[in-house]
């Protein structure tokens, strides 16, 4: 049996505070942080104490619900004004991951018909908790759908961390490996270290070892050689935002892996919930790309590895064109090929069901 339930939850609702696993301290220290204010939540998201698109959305939803509990509003209109201010503030914490805006919009919709402040506060807490509950089942279904793509003994590559600690549980790209472990399918993962913040080495390698899943760590520059020498059968990654045409924003380095996979004729899969799709944008050119602190590149774990004043280009994400993606795995099935039409049909089918 897999040990996935021994892996700490990334975020938990505790009524008067939010408890998060500090992912900046992993793998050396398992530390929890208590978030009590909207500023705490904002900081936790910006500084990557919590990361992964679904986990960011859950944390932001909890943060908005927690802040709303403390509003001292004169009336419902004043409550909604304060709510909108905090929502805007939290929504600005990370611009690329669409789950953040999706979760906050869902909370907004949940109180649209509220007739009292107390009803609104209660509803917000309930809805935020429901988002987390649903995310766990969503991730399990993504894993179930993805599992059909692999066979016993496959060697599979991934980048960044789209695992249990990036979601409520299971993960997206890593979900099939937990389910494969239960079925004794013997899948093996090659995890790219994921410079500059090392989510692959610090988080994915740690998480999979905690779960008893076979994993080998490689540097990002070893990907092509590894594909050739280790007979990689597929690449699977997560996503932070997917455009209407299938173009996908994910951790920097994903685009390069997709190009390599295409060169080696290896299937390249994206695993993501429907909440990661942004049907308001036509293609990847419209996805905002966050640029982060230059010292993330100049330093490793606080130790300087480059000249102090060397200019740095540090985008946190890149865009993989839909043309390089073999399939997008969701909780409702897998879309392939003509993404604009298939994604539109997928959402239409979900509305009918």
UniProtKB/Swiss-Prot annotation:
It holds the Pfam family IF-2B. Keywords: Amino-acid biosynthesis, Isomerase, Methionine biosynthesis. The keyword Isomerase applies. It comes from the Bacteria. GO terms for molecular function: S-methyl-5-thioribose-1-phosphate isomerase activity. GO terms for biological process: L-methionine salvage from methylthioadenosine. Substrate binds at residues 51-53, 94, 199, 250-251. Pathway: Amino-acid biosynthesis; L-methionine biosynthesis via salvage pathway; L-methionine from S-methyl-5-thio-alpha-D-ribose 1-phosphate: step 1/6. It catalyses: 5-(methylsulfanyl)-alpha-D-ribose 1-phosphate = 5-(methylsulfanyl)-D-ribulose 1-phosphate. Its EC number is 5.3.1.23. Signal peptide: none annotated. The record marks 160 as: Transition state stabilizer. The active site is at residue 240. Belongs to the eIF-2B alpha/beta/delta subunits family. MtnA subfamily. Catalyzes the interconversion of methylthioribose-1-phosphate (MTR-1-P) into methylthioribulose-1-phosphate (MTRu-1-P). Homodimer. This is Methylthioribose-1-phosphate isomerase. It comes from Bacillus velezensis (strain DSM 23117 / BGSC 10A6 / LMG 26770 / FZB42) (Bacillus amyloliquefaciens subsp. plantarum).
């Amino acid at each position: 049996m897999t040990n996935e339930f021994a892996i700490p939850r990334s975020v938990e609702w505790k009524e008067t505070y939010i408890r998060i696993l500090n992912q900046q301290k992993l793998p050396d220290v398992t530390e929890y942080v208590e978030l009590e204010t909207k500023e705490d939540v904002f900081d936790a998201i910006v500084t990557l104490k919590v990361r992964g698109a679904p986990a960011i959305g859950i944390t932001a939803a909890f943060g908005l619900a927690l802040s709303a509990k403390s509003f001292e509003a004169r009336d419902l209109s004043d409550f909604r004004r304060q709510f909108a201010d905090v929502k805007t503030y939290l929504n600005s914490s990370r611009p690329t991951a669409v789950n953040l805006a999706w979760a906050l919009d869902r909370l907004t919709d949940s109180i649209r018909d509220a007739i009292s402040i107390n009803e609104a506060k209660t509803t917000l807490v309930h809805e935020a908790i429901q988002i987390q509950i649903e995310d766990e089942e969503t991730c399990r279904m993504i894993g179930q759908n993805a599992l059909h793509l692999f066979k016993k003994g496959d060697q599979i590559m991934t980048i960044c961390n789209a695992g249990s600690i990036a979601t409520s549980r299971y993960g997206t790209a890593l979900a099939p490996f937990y389910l494969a472990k239960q079925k004794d399918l013997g899948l093996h993962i090659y995890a790219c270290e994921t410079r500059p913040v090392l989510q692959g080495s610090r988080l994915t390698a740690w998480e999979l070892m905690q779960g008893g899943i076979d994993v080998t760590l490689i540097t990002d520059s070893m990907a092509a050689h590894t594909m050739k020498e280790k007979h990689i059968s597929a690449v699977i990654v997560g996503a932070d935002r997917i455009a209407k045409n299938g173009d996908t924003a994910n951790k920097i380095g994903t685009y390069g892996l997709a190009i390599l996979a295409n060169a080696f004729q290896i299937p390249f899969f994206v695993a993501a919930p429907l909440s990661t799709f942004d049907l308001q944008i036509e293609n990847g050119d419209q996805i905002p790309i966050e640029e982060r602190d230059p010292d993330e590149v100049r330093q490793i774990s606080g130790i300087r590895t480059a000249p102090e004043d060397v200019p740095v280009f540090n985008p946190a994400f890149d865009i993989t064109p839909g043309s390089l993606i073999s399939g997008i795995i969701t909780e409702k099935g897998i879309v392939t090929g003509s993404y604009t039409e298939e994604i539109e049909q997928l959402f239409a089918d979900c509305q009918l069901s």
